[in-house]
Amino acid sequence: MSVIKRLEERYGEKVQSEVVYNNEHARVLRFYLRAEQEVKPHKSPSSVFITVLKGKLLFLVNDGKSEEILNAGDTVFYNPEELHGFKAIEDSIVEAVITPNPSVNKLNIS
């Protein structure tokens, strides 16, 4: 069992990210975005669940065909190979659960 209690603000001039948890089954990433910073649209070979922990962001949905604003407490789910990305409307923190865990060379978020 692991308990993770920290929710530190780690903003920078670029989107900041950290691996919160990682094993062969799942990867949990936390992203820190200042207003106007974005994670560019990309695809993952895995299912992706993203929860907004703090702030407000604009998310691509419906395989990139539309956008949706999500606030703290909201969650979005993406199927494998579905186009997704997000842009911060205000300083924000999001957590992504990716399952199954893709290999490092397949996860391209830059």
Task: List each model region and its residues.
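Short acidic-glycine-tyrosine-enriched beta hairpin
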Residues: 64-80
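A short, N-terminal "cap"/entry segment at the start of jelly-roll beta-barrel domains
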Residues: 1-25, 60, 71, 110
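Glycine- and acidic-residue-biased ligand/ion/polar-headgroup-sensing regions
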Residues: 46-60
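Conserved short histidine dyad/triad with adjacent acidic residue
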Residues: 27-44
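Histidine-centered metal-chelating micro-motifs
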Residues: 38-39, 58, 76, 80-85
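Short, surface-exposed secondary-structure edge patches
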Residues: 30, 49, 65-68, 85
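Short peripheral tails and domain-boundary helices/loops at the edges of structured domains
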Residues: 102-110
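Ligand-binding loop in jelly-roll beta-barrel domains
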Residues: 71, 80-103
